[in-house]
Curated annotation (Swiss-Prot):
Lineage of the species this protein comes from: Bacteria, Pseudomonadati, Pseudomonadota, Gammaproteobacteria, Pseudomonadales
Role according to the record: Catalyzes the reversible phosphorylation of UMP to UDP.
Source organism per UniProt: Stutzerimonas stutzeri (strain A1501) (Pseudomonas stutzeri)
UniProt pathway annotation: Pyrimidine metabolism; CTP biosynthesis via de novo pathway; UDP from UMP (UMPK route): step 1/1
GO molecular function, one term: UMP kinase activity
Transmembrane segments: none
Keyword terms, alphabetized: ATP-binding, Cytoplasm, Kinase, Nucleotide-binding, Pyrimidine biosynthesis, Transferase
Family indicated by similarity: Belongs to the UMP kinase family.
Protein name: Uridylate kinase
Cysteines engaged in disulfide bonds, as pairs: none
EC number(s) reported in the record: 2.7.4.22
Length: 247
């Protein structure tokens, strides 16, 4: 089976995978579930094994949510800086899981953390990607008021990724929340303008506009489905594809 997979040519040479911090919680209410980390590391390792270059951005919502404390009175900039640190913690945990699976990985941070991570450098990141290392981009964009979704799209554009893959707990984009509305229908494909016009909430406005303005395809899929990530990279139609209109 593994030989058959490696014989197939990947559809994408370089991807940017966006994971939510909540995805790392697994069945826990807070923090990081080591079993989830190990499973994700193996799935990423499958991609590296067939020659795909992988950039990673992980949210921090499993450890800290600046927006929630901001609503309770905390200074928004302070809260966002704390959220950036949470993403660094998740990135370090993911690097450890990858390296324990013998997958070389590098953590880069948008805020300087000498001795803990490398500082973000686009050219250096691309060199490491080309050498087969997984590069994990942490601390968002380094600026408050920007989400990790926006950071993922920005880094994807900077490293010239072929696609942004957004891992969620549902298998694509729906007309409504499928957990609340049993009649919600899934979209197979959408354009950026349709996402904006329908206010589907796939990502924040900044992230969607970045992808649209730079013709960066975006696919939303369920990371909890075994093999979904590999299937996408090999050309499978998992989840929902969002790209610019052909008109």
């Amino acid at each position: 089976m593994a030989q058959q997979m490696s014989a197939r040519n990947p559809r994408y040479k370089r991807i940017l995978l966006k994971l939510s911090g909540e995805a790392l919680m697994g069945s826990e209410d807070f923090g990081i579930d080591p079993k989830v980390l190990d499973r994700m590391a193996l799935e990423v390792g499958q991609l590296v094994g067939i020659g795909v270059e992988v950039g990673l951005v992980i949210g921090g919502g499993n450890l800290f949510r600046g927006a929630a404390l901001s609503a309770a009175g905390m200074d928004r900039v302070t809260g966002d800086h704390m959220g950036m640190l949470a993403t660094v913690m998740n990135a370090l945990a993911m690097r450890d899981a990858l390296e324990r699976s013998n997958i070389p990985a590098l953590v880069m941070s948008a805020i300087s953390m000498v001795g803990v991570t490398d500082h973000y450098d686009r050219r250096k990141a691309m060199r490491h990607l080309k050498s087969g290392e997984v590069v994990i981009f942490s601390a968002g964009t380094g600026n408050p008021f920007f989400t990790t979704d926006s950071a993922a799209c920005l880094r994807a554009i900077e490293i010239q990724a072929d696609v942004v893959l957004k891992a969620t707990k549902v298998d694509g984009v729906y007309t409504a929340d499928p957990f609340k509305d049993p009649n919600a229908e899934k979209f197979a494909e959408l354009t950026y303008d349709e996402v904006l016009d329908r206010k589907l909430g796939v990502m924040d406005l900044t992230a969607i506009c970045l992808c649209r303005d730079h013709s960066m395809p975006l696919r939303v899929f369920n990371m909890n489905k075994p093999g979904a990530l590999l299937n996408i990279v090999l050309g499978g139609a998992e989840g929902t594809l969002i790209e610019e209109s052909n008109e």
